[in-house]
């Protein structure tokens, strides 16, 4: 017998403003509980030290979370100069202290080194896995694991301010970029060492900063719903962004209602105006109802790749 699903079938994306000191999984579980959702997943972990944007997908939106994992990110980071730690952040042990002695011109030259396409060796204190185990577990045991450099892109690296021994930067980068590693490498280039003392993710893909909500915000709404004897969804669900915002950068193909049945059966259908092997958003009818993503085959057919489950009352007969 199949296990009964617990929680509501609620679909959408919450832009959580994660607090410092908590894991991304803890934040995910709290959001899932607040919404009483039957399924939830986040779109790229933030370190416990870090705060900021953590998109959390609920219900059918989890099918598209990988596309947010692959999206560009933006961070505001403050580094403490003159001190290097074994984790490249303030959670680690100090391994070296040095005097700070560089000019603004030398700083700008160093920053330029990180802009554009580069190769980065991931930190040992990362969630990347080696033989099924996260690197940070090896690091905590004092074991150094060989890591290959990986290609990253830093689209923007902007100097914000330098106050005393604290340097603040704004970084727009590709997926898989480790800000702690950039900070540590920058400190070495400046000859003084550095580590992260504040890290805030300010953007994922094109999601708006002002749409973020904190766990405290959500908890307050849950309490309000209980006090007013309302269903929690009446106050929380309006905060959800549509699930197709996870693939908003994909081209759209709008199909007539008559094709809905065939698409939902996973059948390839005739379509035009699409490039071959490019993922697209599939919408149906005049209301442009999102039903999933597909790809154009070289035989001129649009093949569904990932489809949502449509409620029974909306399913085609």
Curated annotation (Swiss-Prot):
Its EC number is 5.4.99.25. SUPFAM superfamilies: Pseudouridine synthase (SSF55120), PUA domain-like (SSF88697). GO terms for biological process: mRNA pseudouridine synthesis; tRNA pseudouridine synthesis. The keyword Lyase does not apply. InterPro entries: PsdUridine_synth_cat_dom_sf, PsdUridine_synth_N, PUA-like_sf, PUA_sf, tRNA_psdUridine_synth_TruB, tRNA_sdUridine_synth_fam1_C, TruB_C. The active site is at residue 47. It comes from the Bacteria. It holds the Pfam family TruB-C_2. Keywords: Isomerase, tRNA processing. It is an enzyme of class 5 (isomerase). Transmembrane segments: none annotated. It catalyses: uridine(55) in tRNA = pseudouridine(55) in tRNA. GO terms for molecular function: RNA binding; tRNA pseudouridine(55) synthase activity. NCBIfam families: TruB (TIGR00431). HAMAP family: TruB_bact (MF_01080). Belongs to the pseudouridine synthase TruB family. Type 1 subfamily. Responsible for synthesis of pseudouridine from uracil-55 in the psi GC loop of transfer RNAs. This is tRNA pseudouridine synthase B.
């Amino acid at each position: 017998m199949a296990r009964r699903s617990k929680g509501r079938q609620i679909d959408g994306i919450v832009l959580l403003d994660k607090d410092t000191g908590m894991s991304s999984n803890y934040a995910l579980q709290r959001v899932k509980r607040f919404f009483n959702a039957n399924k939830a997943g986040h779109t790229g972990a933030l370190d416990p030290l870090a705060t900021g944007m953590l998109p959390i997908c609920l219900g059918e939106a989890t099918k598209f979370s990988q596309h947010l994992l692959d999206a560009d990110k933006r961070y505001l980071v403050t580094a403490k100069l003159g001190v290097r730690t074994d984790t490249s952040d303030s959670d680690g042990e100090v391994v070296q202290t040095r005097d700070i002695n560089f000019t603004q011109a030398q700083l700008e030259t160093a920053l330029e080194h990180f802009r554009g396409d580069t190769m980065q060796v991931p930190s040992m204190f990362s969630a990347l896995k080696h033989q099924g185990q996260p690197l940070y577990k090896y690091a905590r045991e004092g074991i150094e694991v060989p890591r290959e450099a990986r290609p990253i892109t830093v689209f923007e690296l902007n100097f914000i301010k330098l106050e005393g021994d604290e340097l603040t930067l704004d970084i727009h980068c590709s997926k898989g970029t480790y800000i702690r590693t950039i900070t540590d490498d920058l400190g070495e280039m400046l000859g003084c060492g550095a580590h992260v003392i504040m890290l805030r993710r300010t953007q994922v893909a094109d999601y708006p900063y002002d749409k973020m909500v904190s766990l405290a915000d959500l908890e307050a709404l849950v309490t309000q719903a209980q006090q007013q004897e309302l269903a929690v969804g009446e106050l929380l669900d309006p905060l959800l962004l549509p699930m197709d915002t996870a693939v908003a950068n994909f081209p759209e193909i709008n199909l007539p209602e008559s094709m809905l049945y065939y698409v939902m059966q996973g059948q390839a259908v005739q379509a035009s105006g699409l490039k071959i092997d490019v993922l697209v958003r599939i919408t149906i009818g005049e209301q442009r109802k999102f039903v999933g993503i597909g790809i154009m085959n070289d035989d001129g057919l649009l093949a569904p790749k990932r489809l949502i489950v449509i409620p029974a009352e909306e399913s085609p007969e």
